[in-house]
């Protein structure tokens, strides 16, 4: 029985899921956190069991070794030969990659070259790819790009209104992100609605620590909220989302703590969003607790968050000339009914009627009333499964 492992590498983490394919059965999953520190944590979940170790893991190569040792130690695999494919989530594929790609030296170099488009993600992905190639050089290795799904956008959508030389010479344009998630939930929505995806107009809202909204026309991305980098779009957990770009030189000139544009961008990526406005947390659960206690900063952060998401959904309702369904997914999208309620409350003009009971009780699927003109669905995303499927598809070529 062949097994495929889906990898999502962060700068100090390695999240993984092992599948039996083509059955798509999850055999085990886990995460290695705090890579590079002396109290790294390796967690493995399998057969309703959970094993956790505190280790000294210096880099991603050692993390991969620990992961593989854990799989054999717990009898999840007998030997490494059972693993016939590995798929790596890569956030930025730029214009190099319109679909998933088999890994070779050139692909790894291109992933690293594109780090400017996803500085929080691509370097870590490259480290994970190199680690697996070093330890398991003979298995099929595939890169699955968050940006690939959005390559169907047209020039009038992906180009910025700046001199064309910045696109032709430097490839400055909208690329989007979370494409694997948007593609998965759109496919699942079509199944739940009982209609071909090629007939549907959908708005998919990936609302986690990162937030992106996509307009999906007949199965293709025609617009999305993230841009040249994943910093663009609505307000997020620690990211600002869209701001007036003139703010950047203004802050460099006036705040001595922000010495250059890179420092401002770092602040916009890591210290802004819910965290920046609330002053306390990037976690919606903490923000909602602040609503209950009437913390004015939490209330403000929440209201800005709702406002920004609502505006993007309204924008894409116009772009699509209406929609058959709006889909919420990812951490907050799946688990924050108050957020869903307040976003949809501002869209009632479009004939959307939420069912309060279905929404509040964590109902996955349609959470609208039967006569709602636009359906609202809650669909758990499964990027790891999409990655595993692409590995199998490319193995078969």
From Swiss-Prot:
The lineage of its organism: Bacteria, Bacillati, Bacillota, Bacilli, Lactobacillales. Homodimer. GO terms for biological process: acetate metabolic process; acetyl-CoA biosynthetic process. GO terms for cellular component: cytoplasm. The gene is ackA. Mg(2+). Can also accept Mn(2+). SUPFAM superfamilies: Actin-like ATPase domain. ATP binds at residues 15, 206-210, 283-285, 331-335. GO terms for molecular function: acetate kinase activity; ATP binding; magnesium ion binding. This is Acetate kinase. Substrate binds at residue 89.
